[in-house]
Curated annotation (Swiss-Prot):
<feature type="zinc finger region" description="C2H2-type 4">
    <location>
        <begin position="706"/>
        <end position="728"/>
    </location>
</feature>
<feature type="cross-link" description="Glycyl lysine isopeptide (Lys-Gly) (interchain with G-Cter in SUMO2)">
    <location>
        <position position="673"/>
    </location>
</feature>
<dbReference type="GO" id="GO:0030177">
    <property type="term" value="P:positive regulation of Wnt signaling pathway"/>
</dbReference>
<feature type="compositionally biased region" description="Basic and acidic residues">
    <location>
        <begin position="937"/>
        <end position="949"/>
    </location>
</feature>
<dbReference type="GO" id="GO:0045893">
    <property type="term" value="P:positive regulation of DNA-templated transcription"/>
</dbReference>
<comment type="similarity">
    <text>Belongs to the sal C2H2-type zinc-finger protein family.</text>
</comment>
<dbReference type="GO" id="GO:0021983">
    <property type="term" value="P:pituitary gland development"/>
</dbReference>
<feature type="compositionally biased region" description="Low complexity">
    <location>
        <begin position="135"/>
        <end position="158"/>
    </location>
</feature>
<feature type="zinc finger region" description="C2H2-type 10">
    <location>
        <begin position="1162"/>
        <end position="1184"/>
    </location>
</feature>
<feature type="zinc finger region" description="C2H2-type 7">
    <location>
        <begin position="1001"/>
        <end position="1023"/>
    </location>
</feature>
<dbReference type="GO" id="GO:0003337">
    <property type="term" value="P:mesenchymal to epithelial transition involved in metanephros morphogenesis"/>
</dbReference>
<feature type="cross-link" description="Glycyl lysine isopeptide (Lys-Gly) (interchain with G-Cter in SUMO2)">
    <location>
        <position position="1219"/>
    </location>
</feature>
<feature type="compositionally biased region" description="Polar residues">
    <location>
        <begin position="321"/>
        <end position="336"/>
    </location>
</feature>
<feature type="modified residue" description="Phosphoserine">
    <location>
        <position position="595"/>
    </location>
</feature>
<dbReference type="GO" id="GO:0008270">
    <property type="term" value="F:zinc ion binding"/>
</dbReference>
<feature type="zinc finger region" description="C2H2-type 5">
    <location>
        <begin position="734"/>
        <end position="756"/>
    </location>
</feature>
<feature type="zinc finger region" description="C2H2-type 6">
    <location>
        <begin position="766"/>
        <end position="788"/>
    </location>
</feature>
Length: 1324
């Protein structure tokens, strides 16, 4: 046993300046062995044993050194050779004897720190307890010190030795003095040192700390009060007990690890090699802890020895803590009772402790000097019954600091002991600087709560302890439901709220659960610290017991049929394939089925929360996962259905619920293990109580059928709910057939298809080289020429009244196909190949066509590229076509452009009524009739089998076959064809086409379908770029009246003309004025919509009247259009007075000026936020649209402030949302920007806060109320059936458009509102 000896100085009560050095020299002359290193140069202080290599440093130190300092000598050289230790003669007086005892005790205690052997590596700790009694003289004290290394010494026996320990330990017990026996401590000076063992608040261990209070108190030289000394002694004993408990837990962990690594059953006597190989880092740390704890215990026993030498030999009863009840209890517990030291020493000989002690020291029997000095930590293991039994919950007094012993070893060694820091200090300092220099006050504050790893400083020890877990990886708090671990209790509280819905009867475990208990199997199969069986077994268990073998793998999640898309997502995380039953759920690729999917989804969603609340599903233990980590497959807010281990549950195909009768029993078992009922009241008042109440309220209230069961978000409808589920699953069912990209919604797919679509240039009219028919879409023209070449269309010029239904058909086919995706199952779209459409039987009457899906040529974006493609036609047709296209490029539009286009509506109507009388009104022109329908050959009934030939969509007909199957037209698009698709398969894909689902509200150019004709009319202006509504202030044009009205609000009142607020009845309809009457304005709208009137500034002078349709239109439709030559954009003539920027309009300048003034006139009527522009407000309003109707989603939102109409007439505006009608009718915000128009807006109704200017969905309920005249003449678009529209209902599309032309009293306004759907403005 290597010991590092230091020359022992003798203390004199005389003047320290005179007596200390001679005494030290005298000791050296008496023949005491000196230290092995630098014995001649070292100068040792006679009071504190501090050594100095310079005499001047020693003299300087003695000025500040006080008597009776306790010195902790840190082991710096564990490999030093052992030396003999000769005792010095006893001192002459009793005071010297007392001081001599203290010094000897310190020397023995410090020498114990230098022991590095196998016993230390096995977490053993030597606590030498030298005792001085009254009858023992100085000789007995000296002999005790001299025989300390021997195996038969009394100190070795008292420290819990092995088999060679002597049994007579009761004679050498350490007793604590009573209060009355400390009166003789008058000469005992206060301990004044940098290092002191003090009782720290909120800690459970003895910590060597720099204490400013102790140093300041010691500087005054005052005497230590007896109560304070007793308090320190009692606190020291209590802390020592907690340290021994810590070592017991460390020993248990090492034995467990050793048994696991060696694949041997856990034995009580593991070999030294096994411990070295399995727990090498733990052995090093435990050795370090053993030294430090031995020093702490040695100090405690040295204090007790001093008290015992003064008070006498009489046996003292055990001293209890002041707050604890008095008694003669022996077994220490976590409650804090301080046992007597002699009981701890005598407990070594008990049979229960001898077994553990002998097992710990079995590998050291060969060393006679060590065999009898086993660790007292093992000796006290029998006394620490609560800590040694891992089945019992650890009380908060012990486990709040050491909740999990394995990661906390480094924390304790690095943070809670200053001895290692002192050792590092001494090693880093120069030899002439003492290691015990006092630090400054600021340094002490930093040193007290400073992280040893990253040097971060914290304000409290608890914050430091939590921070240290980030270094050690300790997660002491365990969720008793899913088994996840957390570093703090607050994180566990937040996490546990996610389980409240599924497990409302299970309470959270607020106590730390040691991590090593996770690997210990139990008889019930439920791991320690958990209330229910884990949903997947832990792979690191010693014996893999099945978890609840009564539960089979047939138990699964209660997934409703609305969540079939979650099944493949869950399957991807399963290690083994699991057969999924499709009896209760839809196919994995299908989200919506044709047979009442939403209804069944509603029922399942409605019934799910009650099932989830009443009967919670236990997990199946039939399979295991490779990793032991608990992973979240979906957001954990959905713990009611998809909690974190949901990826490993049973087959998701079984939609049955299972009531687990064991859950109440498991909850009671958990309560028995963790008696924390009193803590739940405080948890209710925590920061998570509001969240918990919110979750409970959600459980209690009636669930919305459109509520997401994962995040509890309420959607507007079932389709929106299904699209929302894709955000959780990551599913993208809608794939582009051209490029393969997938999208979550069909709207995104349709938006994406615009990338592939070849849009014609602005105002380009393509003329057929055969019949001179005009088309605005090049793809439509190609199909038209194909029909010419196939003989389906006569190669003679058609009259003006010829049907233009082909253009309607082919143009609307572009994107009607994707609008129809709502009406067929997504399974069909998923299962079919990406580059094709499933083949279906073809009609015998319909002409065959070849469709293939290939990438669309980029050359289709220009007319020049179209010319190159059309060179494949024969020479004669190619010359005519090229000449026509070149003329179009040069801008020389032929004279019959307007006539041909404007006659399209009438001709369309005549052709359909004459050629297909069997066609119902509901199918009209949306049936994509070919020009050959006048022969009545194909149209017997609107059945799918007898569908006429359809046009080629630009998405699918990217490569038309150059050799059609049945004599079709030439290939005008691509020279390569891929997969041949039969044309009538589209009839199967779009089954609602012949059922009147789509009326004549499809755009002939881009194929979009709208809910009403007025929306289609407004949409056509996006293609023609017509802006018929002109602002009289800045001459800007707008496509809709609503946009013009919104724009007018940007002008100040002084800018508005005075005639704006007066009736304009004095203006004649034929007057060529800048003021356009309402009747001529409506005529302009109709003729533009029906005939694509393109009035350019240069043509408006030569063309005072436009060509009107030849069909039976109303008289107002033939009224002249008097539109002056107004420029589209004026030069920049508006200047900002602040920064000098120029703008082309006053509205742009006004918006710009708001950046200088900070004005935000556009306020949100929902949340009150204000914005500088209406566009920003529109974007913001999208954040409030999550619970709106489907028509509101993804559409253009027109946000108007609560302004009233400019005039005194009652106004009825369109309202898209029925649920907002009652709340928003008549509402006005007086604090908004519109107050400046109070004079003009005093009379009339308030405008609604939200309106859709472009309606793209059907199913809009009509607003109740008077619609005015019920027999007004509507106007149809290009595809309109005029006869049907004339006999339509008053609430039919565009039913009130004529009200603007002929109002009841003949009073017209320039700001007459454009009518949308069945809502109108009644002007009087």
């Amino acid at each position: 046993m290597s010991r590092r000896k230091q020359a022992k100085p003798q203390h004199f009560q005389s003047d320290p300046e005179v007596a200390s050095l001679p005494r030290r020299d005298g000791d050296t002359e008496k023949g005491q062995p000196s230290r092995p290193t630098k014995s001649k140069d070292a100068h040792v202080c006679g009071r504190c044993c501090a050594e100095f290599f310079e005499l001047s440093d020693l003299l300087l130190h003695k000025k500040n050194c006080t008597k009776n300092q306790l010195v902790l000598i840190v082991n710096e050289n564990p490999a030093s050779p052992p030396e003999t230790f000769s005792p010095s003669p006893p001192p002459d007086n009793p005071d010297e004897q007392m001081n001599d005892t203290v010094n000897k005790t310190d020397q023995v205690d410090c020498s114990d720190l230098s022991e590095h052997n196998g016993l230390d590596r096995e977490e053993s700790m030597e606590v030498e307890a030298p005792v001085a009694n009254k009858s023992g003289s100085g000789t007995s004290s000296g002999s005790h010190s001299s025989t300390a290394p021997s195996s038969s010494s009394s100190s070795s026996s008292s420290s819990g030795g092995g088999g060679s320990s002597s049994t007579g330990t009761s004679a050498i017990t350490t007793s604590l003095p009573q209060l009355g026996d400390l009166t003789t401590l008058g000469n005992f000076s206060v301990i004044n040192s940098n290092v002191i063992i003090e009782n720290l608040q909120s800690t459970k261990v003895a910590v060597a700390q720099f204490s400013q209070e102790a140093r300041c108190g010691g500087a005054s030289g005052g005497k230590l009060a007896v109560p304070a000394l007793m308090e320190q002694l009692l606190a020291l004993q209590q802390q020592q007990i907690h340290q021994l408990q810590l070592i017991e837990q460390i020993r248990h962990q090492i034995l467990l690890l050793a048994s696991q690594n060696a694949d041997l059953p856990t034995s009580s006597s593991p070999s030294q090699g096994t411990l070295r190989t399995s727990a090498n880092p733990l052995s090093t740390l435990s050795s370090h802890l053993s030294q430090q704890l031995a020093a702490a215990a040695g100090l405690a026993q040295s204090l007790a020895s001093q008290s015992a030498s003064i008070s006498g030999v009489k046996q003292l009863p055990p001293i209890q803590l002041p707050q604890s009840s008095s008694g003669n209890t022996i077994i220490p517990s976590n409650s804090g009772s301080s046992p007597n030291m002699n009981i701890l020493a005598a407990a070594v000989t008990t049979p229960s402790s001898e077994k553990v002690a002998s097992s710990a020291g079995a590998s050291h029997v060969s060393n006679p000097a060590v065999s009898s000095s086993s660790s007292p930590a093992f000796a006290i293991s029998s006394l620490l019954s609560p800590a040694s039994n891992p089945l019992l919950p650890q009380q908060a007094s012990a486990n709040s600091v050491f909740p999990s012993p394995l990661p906390n070893i480094g924390t304790t060694a690095e943070d809670l002991n200053s001895l290692s820091a002192l050792a590092q200090q001494r090693k880093s300092k120069p030899p002439n600087v003492t290691a015990f220099e006092a630090k400054s006050t600021s340094d002490e504050a930093f040193f007290k709560h400073k992280c040893r790893f990253c040097a971060k400083v914290f304000g409290s020890d608890s914050a430091l302890q939590i921070h240290l877990r980030s270094h050690t990886g300790e997660r002491p708090f365990k969720c008793n439901i899913c088994g996840n671990r957390f570093s703090t209790k607050g994180n566990l509280k937040v996490h546990f709220q996610r389980h409240k819905e599924k497990y409302p009867h299970i309470q959270m475990n607020p106590y730390p659960v040691p991590e090593h208990l996770d690997n210990i199997p139990t008889s019930t199969g439920i791991p320690y610290g958990m209330s229910i069986p884990p949903e997947k077994p832990v792979t690191s268990w010693l014996d893999t017991k099945p978890v609840l073998p009564t539960l089979t793998t047939s138990v699964g999640l209660p997934l409703p049929p609305t969540l079939p898309s979650l099944i493949p997502f869950i399957k991807t995380e399963e290690p083994a394939p699991i057969p999924i039953s499709h009896s209760a759920t839809s196919p994995p690729g299908s989200v919506k089925s044709d047979s009442g999917g939403p209804e069944s989804a509603t029922r399942n969603l409605g019934g799910l929360p009650e099932e989830a609340e009443g009967s919670t599903l236990p997990p199946s233990g039939g399979k295991s996962e490779e990793s032991g980590m608990v992973t979240n497959s979906v957001p954990t807010a959905s713990s009611s259905v998809l909690s974190s281990p949901a990826a490993d549950c049973g087959p998701a195909g079984s939609a049955t619920t299972f009531t687990n009768p064991l859950l109440p029993l498991m909850s009671e078992q958990f309560k028995a293990k963790f008696p924390f009922g009193g803590l739940l009241d405080s948890a209710q008042a925590s920061e998570t109580s509001k969240l918990q109440q919110l979750v409970e309220n959600i459980d209690k209230k009636a669930t919305d059928p459109n509520e997401c069961i994962i995040c509890h978000r309420v959607l507007s409808c079932q389709s929106a709910l299904k699209m929302h589920y894709r955000t959780h699953t990551g599913e993208r069912p809608f794939k582009c057939k051209i490029c393969g990209r997938a999208f979550t919604t069909k709207g995104n797919l349709k938006t994406h298809y615009s990338v592939h679509r070849a849009m014609p240039p602005l105002r380009v009219q393509h003329s057929c080289p055969i019949c001179q028919k005009k088309f605005t879409n090049a793809v439509v023209l190609q199909q038209h020429i194909r029909m010419h070449m196939g003989g389906q269309i006569p190669n003679t010029p058609v009259p003006d009244s010829y049907s233009e239904s082909m253009e309607s058909d082919t143009g609307s086919f572009d994107e009607k196909n994707f609008d129809d995706l709502d009406n067929f199952s997504d399974e069909n779209m998923e299962d079919c190949p990406e580059g094709s459409i499933p083949d279906t039987p073809k009609s015998a009457d319909a002409s065959q066509d070849s469709l293939s899906s290939s990438p669309l040529p980029l050359e289709m974006s220009s007319i020049a590229a179209l010319e190159n493609q059309m060179k494949m036609i024969n020479a004669g047709l190619a010359e005519q076509l090229q000449a026509s296209l070149k003329s179009v490029e040069n801008g020389s539009i032929e004279g019959d452009v307007l006539t041909n286009d404007s006659s399209s509506v009438g001709g369309d109507m005549e052709s359909q009524s004459a050629g297909s009388p069997a066609i119902s009104e509901s199918t009209s022109s949306m049936q994509a009739l070919s020009p050959s329908n006048s022969t009545q050959e194909f149209h017997k009934s609107p059945s799918i089998e007898e569908k006429p030939q359809r046009a080629v969509p630009s998405e699918f007909a990217n490569g038309l076959s150059p050799t059609p199957v049945n004599g079709g037209a030439l290939d005008l698009t691509s020279s390569h064809a891929e997969k041949i698709i039969k044309e009538d398969s589209l009839g199967i894909l779009f089954p609602f086409r012949d059922r009147g689902k789509f009326k004549n509200t499809a755009c002939d150019i881009c194929g979009k379908t709208f809910a009403c004709q007025s929306a289609l009319d407004i949409h056509y202006r996006s293609h023609t770029k017509e802006r018929p509504f002109i602002c009289t202030v800045c001459n800007r044009g707008f496509s809709t009246k609503g946009n013009l009205k919104q724009h007018m609000l940007t002008h100040q009142m002084r800018d508005l003309p005075s005639q704006l607020f007066e009736p304009s009845s004095n203006l004649g309809p034929n007057q060529n004025s800048a003021v356009i009457p309402a009747n001529s304005l409506s005529s302009l709208i109709k003729t533009e919509v029906n005939g694509f009137v393109h009035v350019s500034p240069q043509d408006s002078k030569d063309t005072p009247t436009s060509h009107v349709p030849s069909g039976p239109l109303s008289s107002s439709a033939t009224s002249p259009v008097l539109l002056p030559a107004l420029p589209r954009r004026t030069p920049k003539q508006h200047y900002c007075n602040t920064c000098g920027k120029t703008f082309s309009s006053s509205s742009a300048l006004q918006i710009h000026e708001r950046t200088h003034t900070g004005e935000k006139p556009f306020a949100c009527t929902i949340c009150g936020r204000a914005f500088t522009t209406k566009g920003n407000l529109k974007v913001h309003m999208g954040t409030h649209m999550w619970n709106s109707t489907p028509a509101r989603r993804g559409r253009r939102l027109s946000v108007d402030g609560p302004m009233t109409f400019l005039g005194g007439n009652p106004v009825k505006f369109p309202e898209m949302f029925q649920k907002d009608l009652a709340a928003r009718s008549g509402s006005g915000d007086p604090s908004s920007f519109w107050n400046q128009y109070a004079a003009a807006l005093s009379n009339g109704l308030a405008m609604k806060a939200n309106e859709i200017s472009v309606i793209q969905n059907g199913g809009i309920p009509p607003i109740p109320g008077s619609l005015g005249s019920g027999n007004s003449s509507p106007v149809s678009g290009l595809t309109g059936n005029l006869e049907r529209l004339q006999n339509s209902e008053p609430n039919a599309p565009l039913a009130g458009l004529e009200k603007m032309a002929s109002s009841e009293n003949g009073t017209n306004f320039r700001f007459t509102r454009f009518v949308e759907d069945s809502k109108e403005i009644v002007t009087s």
